[in-house]
A protein has these predicted regions:
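Sequence-specific dsDNA recognition surfaces
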Residues: 7-60
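A short glycine-rich beta-alpha junction/loop motif
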Residues: 83-88, 123-149
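Non-catalytic DNA-recognition/assembly elements of restriction-modification systems
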Residues: 1-20, 137-160
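Short amphipathic beta-strand starts and helix->beta connectors
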Residues: 76, 121-124
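A short beta-sheet element
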Residues: 57, 61-112
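Periplasmic-binding protein-like
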Residues: 114-117
Length: 160
C-alpha cells in the first residue's frame, strides 16, 4: 500500500465519554507506555470516583500528555469487560468494526513509528500534548476487513 492509500484515522474512530456517575464500576486502571493496562497505583482514598471514565471491551484509552513517557505514547486496547480510568485520559472506539478492526489499529499503535509521530505532533512547553485532533489526523493503511483479519492472525501467531 502506497502512502496515497493511507486513510485519515478520524474517519474511523469516535470519542467516548461515559462517566461513573452511579459509582458502579470500581476497577481503576492506568495505561503504561508499554501499551497495556495496569492496576492504578493512585491513592484514591476519599476520591470521588463518579467523574472517572467508564471503559468497556474494544475501546481504546490514551494519555494525551506525552511528556516524561520515554518517547512513547501511552495507549491501550481494553480486553476486559469494564473498568474506570482517570478523567484526564482520552477514550475512543472504532465507529464501524466492519471497516476497521480494533486489533489491527492496536498493531499500528504499537509501532515505534507511531510513537515518533505522536511525539513529533505533540505541542506545548512544560507539558507536551498529543490531542484528539492530532489523533484524528493520523494516516494509516486500512486494507479491506479480510486482509486486516489475516494480518492480525499472522501478528498474533508470531507474538504468542
Amino acid at each position: 500500500m502506497g502512502r496515497s492509500s493511507y486513510k485519515r484515522l478520524g474517519d474511523y474512530i469516535q470519542p467516548v465519554d461515559i462517566r461513573n456517575e452511579e459509582r458502579k464500576v470500581e476497577t481503576l486502571l492506568g495505561v503504561s507506555n508499554a501499551k497495556v493496562f495496569m492496576p492504578s497505583i493512585a491513592n484514591t482514598i476519599g476520591t470521588d470516583m463518579s467523574n472517572y471514565k467508564v471503559i468497556t471491551k474494544g475501546q481504546f484509552v490514551y494519555i494525551p500528555d506525552t511528556s516524561r513517557r520515554g518517547n512513547k505514547i501511552s495507549i491501550a486496547l481494553m480486553q476486559e469487560e469494564e473498568a474506570i480510568v482517570s478523567q484526564a485520559y482520552t477514550v475512543f472506539e472504532v465507529a464501524d468494526k466492519s471497516e476497521l478492526l480494533p486489533d489491527y489499529l492496536m498493531m499500528w499503535f504499537r509501532r515505534p513509528g507511531f510513537d515518533r509521530y505522536a511525539r513529533f505532533k505533540s505541542h506545548g512547553s512544560a507539558r507536551e500534548i498529543f490531542d484528539w485532533e492530532e489523533m484524528c489526523e493520523v494516516r494509516l493503511p486500512i486494507p479491506d476487513i479480510e486482509e486486516q483479519r489475516e494480518i492480525v492472525a499472522q501478528y498474533e501467531a508470531i507474538t504468542r
